């Protein structure tokens, strides 16, 4: 959205798909395999694209999918528990992510200094800048105000102050927009144009997306699939909740099972009522997955119900 406001042709590669020059390719992997990726890059160049915003997964780094690519800027948001079914430990997961910032692969790292791993990456990156809300950094925000409709804050962007308005709520969106603004400023985009671009973004599909109202209740859909992601979403909504906060979720099958009870605990702590249901069980029994989540919920509350069929669960939750 910032590139668009600046009149710059930009491509986008990530979990939501591949987008450029009015083209859209449905996602298969967060980071495509190298052969397909380079084919997309070539077509982007032919289509007049000059910049690419790309999500690079830890799996892609582990398998060397982006070994031949040199990045102008690499943003580090945070390191939280995920993919331990593959990496085994947080140390190995962090080591995979760290590959993006080491050596000549990344010309400049843009690091979240409120995250311990983000601060540590400053020692391995050849050049880095920082953003934060709680620790000293190059870019930070003050006077943050949030509601269901979005948030606004004053950004200090390398000592240049400007009001930023977002159509998305949540402190995590403040962090993400600061990182985007910092990159855009380094590229040379004027701060008023950066603010215009951020304000023009109506929503990000499935990212704390406001789905509408039902019987006076505001309904949000979020991609949260980790304990940290679920907690951030519930914390973002809680201050603006006029009544009860109901959380409906499940966990994917054949993926990190350790996070299932942890996510149950998060929902029990931060929501008033939890609806446990199925979410892409793959080759596992959906009920077995839900029972693993339930172990975490039961530690803190009895305010929950299991409705394995997702459609029925959604109907129950909105009526609740």
Regions found by a protein language model. Give the residues of each.
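Conserved nucleotide-sensing/catalytic segment adjacent to the nucleotide-binding pocket
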Residues: 24-57
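Short beta-strand-centered segment that lines the nucleotide-binding/catalytic pocket of NTP-utilizing
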Residues: 6-20, 56-57, 249
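Short, ordered loop/turn segments at secondary-structure junctions
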Residues: 15-16, 58, 79, 133, ...
């Amino acid at each position: 959205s910032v590139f668009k406001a600046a009149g710059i042709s930009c491509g986008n590669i990530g979990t939501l798909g591949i987008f450029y020059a009015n083209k859209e390719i449905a996602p298969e992997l967060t980071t495509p395999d190298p052969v397909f990726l380079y084919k997309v890059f070539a077509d982007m160049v032919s289509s007049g694209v000059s910049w690419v915003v790309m999500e690079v997964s830890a799996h892609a780094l582990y398998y060397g999918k982006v070994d031949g690519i040199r990045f102008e800027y690499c943003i580090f948001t945070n390191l939280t528990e995920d993919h331990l079914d593959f990496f085994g430990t947080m140390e190995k997961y962090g080591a995979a992510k760290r590959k993006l910032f080491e050596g000549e692969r990344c010309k400049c790292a843009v690091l979240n200094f409120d995250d311990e791993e983000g601060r540590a990456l400053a020692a391995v990156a050849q050049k880095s800048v920082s953003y934060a809300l709680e620790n000293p950094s190059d870019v930070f925000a003050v006077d943050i105000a949030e509601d269901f409709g979005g948030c606004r804050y004053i950004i200090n962007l390398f000592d240049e102050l400007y009001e930023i308005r977002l159509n998305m709520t949540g402190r995590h969106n403040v962090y993400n927009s600061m990182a985007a603004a910092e990159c855009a400023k380094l590229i040379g985009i004027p701060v008023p144009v950066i603010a215009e671009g951020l304000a023009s973004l109506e929503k990000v599909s499935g990212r704390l997306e406001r789905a509408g109202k039902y019987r006076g209740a505001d309904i949000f859909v979020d991609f949260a699939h980790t304990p940290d992601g679920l907690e951030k979403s519930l914390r973002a909504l809680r201050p603006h909740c006029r009544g009860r906060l109901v959380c409906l979720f499940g966990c994917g099958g054949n993926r990190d099972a350790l996070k299932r009870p942890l996510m149950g605990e998060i929902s029990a702590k931060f929501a008033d009522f939890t609806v446990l249901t199925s979410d892409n069980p793959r080759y596992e029994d959906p009920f077995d997955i839900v029972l693993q989540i339930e172990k975490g919920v039961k530690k803190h509350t009895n305010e929950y119900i299991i409705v394995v069929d997702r459609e029925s669960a959604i109907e129950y939750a909105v009526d609740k």
